[in-house]
Amino acid sequence: MLSPYMSPIERVWFYSLRILCGLILLFLILPVLVIIPLSFNSGSFLVYPLQGFSLQWYHDFFASAEWMRALKNSIIVAPAATVLAMVFGTLAAIGLTRGDFPGKALVMALVISPMVVPVVIIGVASYLFFAPLGLGNSFFSLIVVHAVLGVPFVIITVSATLQGFNQNLVRAAASLGASPLTAFRRVTLPLIAPGVISGALFAFATSFDEVVVTLFLAGPEQATLPRQMFSGIRENLSPTIAAAATLLVAFSVILLLTLEWLRGRSEKLRTAQA
């Protein structure tokens, strides 16, 4: 909020900073804003100006066997990878947060390294690992590697939630006769659930949008929606791709709104514990 006691220089800085932030935001979302109208264009090319309004490309998307197979594959791979990432990421976060052992920082760096290692390197390494096993073009390898890419997000969000967790609640449950598993299920898990779900949503979005690893590990029968879009751009540029992209944007917006709701709920739980 602009204070009436600001000097002229402070006012200039105040407005300049907001204009700069607005320009950066516009730069980031402009490609998205450009592609959405094209998905409703009646013309057969991804060009402006629009020739008219039409839902033809959405009809073509849902009527195409290739696009539906890609969508089905994404619906298979992303939830499965999310479940694996959520389970292993949560367990790793609990162990790294509560444990105190030599090399803890190194272990943390290793488990979150998929976030910083170039995805193409992960794709090549995964192919070289799974191909000799006969799993180069399989859902199994695709799900496992997508889960590996999602685990760091779960670890980070769950670890952040555990930082404000009151361990006295677990001790109180143990003093009342609860086993460690019961205490985790009835006390710990409900309180860290916002962090777990937030990490799971990040892992799901990562898997659902991933294309580089999929190019290395998926055959034609395992092609996901992003890979189908990539192939379409290279082979047959059609506004159907814009329709698919718009659906992905809508899905991403829903995920962001869900994450924002979970963030608010997590803040309320942390305040209540304090």
Each model region followed by its residue ranges:
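Hydrophobic alpha-helical transmembrane segments of multipass integral membrane proteins
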Residues: 26, 68, 72, 76-88, ...
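Membrane-interfacial helix termini and adjacent extracytoplasmic/periplasmic loops
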Residues: 3-7, 46, 50, 55, ...
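Short membrane-interfacial helix/loop motifs at transmembrane-helix boundaries
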Residues: 30-65, 215-220, 274
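C-terminal transmembrane helix and the adjacent membrane-cytosol boundary/short C-terminal tail
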Residues: 2-19, 159-174, 180-189, 242-274
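Transmembrane-helix boundary motif in ABC transporter permease subunits
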Residues: 2-10, 79-111, 128, 167-170, ...
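Loop-to-helix entry region at the N-terminal start of transmembrane alpha-helices
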Residues: 69-76, 128-153, 157, 193-195, ...
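Interhelical loop and adjacent transmembrane-helix boundary motif
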Residues: 7-13, 43, 58-66, 208-258, ...
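Transmembrane alpha-helices
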Residues: 19-20, 25-32, 148, 155-167, ...
